[in-house]
A protein has these predicted regions:
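Short, well-ordered amphipathic alpha-helices
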Residues: 47-49, 87-94, 205-208
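Predominantly the C-terminal beta-signal and adjacent terminal strand-loop region
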Residues: 201-249
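Extended aliphatic helical segments
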Residues: 43, 47, 53, 57, ...
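Outer-membrane pore/translocation modules
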Residues: 39, 54-185, 193-199, 219-227, ...
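Outer-membrane beta-barrel initiation region
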Residues: 1-79, 84-87
């Protein structure tokens, strides 16, 4: 088990042995979105870990989960509105002389994402992806491209094996660009962008973190605007802001 204590480490591309942090991992007790009248405030949290199979083989298995908890919705017993489950496996290709400023590394993988709900709220998709990335000093540029594995759209609407969301890429596009930059005094800004030029839809997200209480914790500001913040509402434009704490960034 490894938690990066270096304040300038990027968890996504860190090559720690065994179990380690992966994507942003945070707890945001206070978030606000005007998209959900009567339930504007939700607790948003994510968990994300990866496991390297062997020190000499850069094969990783990873699991990420993002949850939306309506902690203030007492009239409905404070439900979890949505959980998104995201297991994946990927192989990391890195040049031997990775210290050179011009080097590119690449992740090649397969991932599944679903929300575990029953019809008509079930959402899921599977993707093959390639993600070249450039990392030098205090900058990381990670550009992920994917191909969705086709599902059967001809099955009846009540069949759970039917494609739940055949148009999801109209809202997510086929690529995501992530840029992370270390700033002064170990502050960090992380932004991500998705866009489909055919439909004109996409999203932009931002996470700003500063060193917080204790080693490995960071005060966090979160902002998102666009589509597919969650699978359930992939086709609804959402604007959300939130504050909390992170352990991976």
């Amino acid at each position: 088990w490894s938690i990066a204590t270096d304040l300038d480490t990027f968890a996504l591309t860190a090559d720690a042995r065994g179990l380690s942090l992966h994507k942003p991992m945070y707890l945001l007790p206070g978030t606000y979105s005007g998209r959900y009248p009567g339930n504007n405030s939700e607790v948003l949290f994510s968990v994300s870990l990866k496991f390297r199979v062997h020190k000499s083989v850069p094969l990783y298995f990873a699991y990420s989960q993002k949850s939306y908890f309506q902690a203030l919705n007492g009239s409905q017993s404070k439900p979890f509105r949505e959980n998104n489950f995201n297991p994946e496996a990927f192989f990391r290709l890195k040049p031997k002389r990775a210290e050179k400023w011009w080097y590119l590394a690449t992740d090649i993988g397969i991932e599944h994402e679903s929300n575990g709900q029953s019809l008509p709220d079930s959402r899921s998709w599977d993707r093959l992806y390639i993600a070249p990335y450039w990392q030098h000093g205090k900058t990381l540029v990670y550009w992920k491209w994917w191909w969705r594995i086709p599902e059967d759209q001809k099955r009846p609407p009540t069949d759970p094996k039917r494609d739940d969301n055949p148009d999801i890429q109209d809202y997510t596009g086929y690529t995501e660009l992530k840029i992370q930059q270390q700033l002064f005094k170990h502050h960090q800004i992380s932004s991500n962008f998705r866009f489909n030029p055919t439909t004109g839809r996409g999203s932009a997200g931002l996470i700003y973190t500063v060193p917080g209480p204790g080693d490995g914790f960071f005060w966090t500001f979160y902002a998102f605007n666009g589509y597919a913040e969650s699978l359930l509402d992939y086709d609804r434009s959402v604007t959300r802001v939130g504050v909390g704490i992170s352990v991976a960034r």
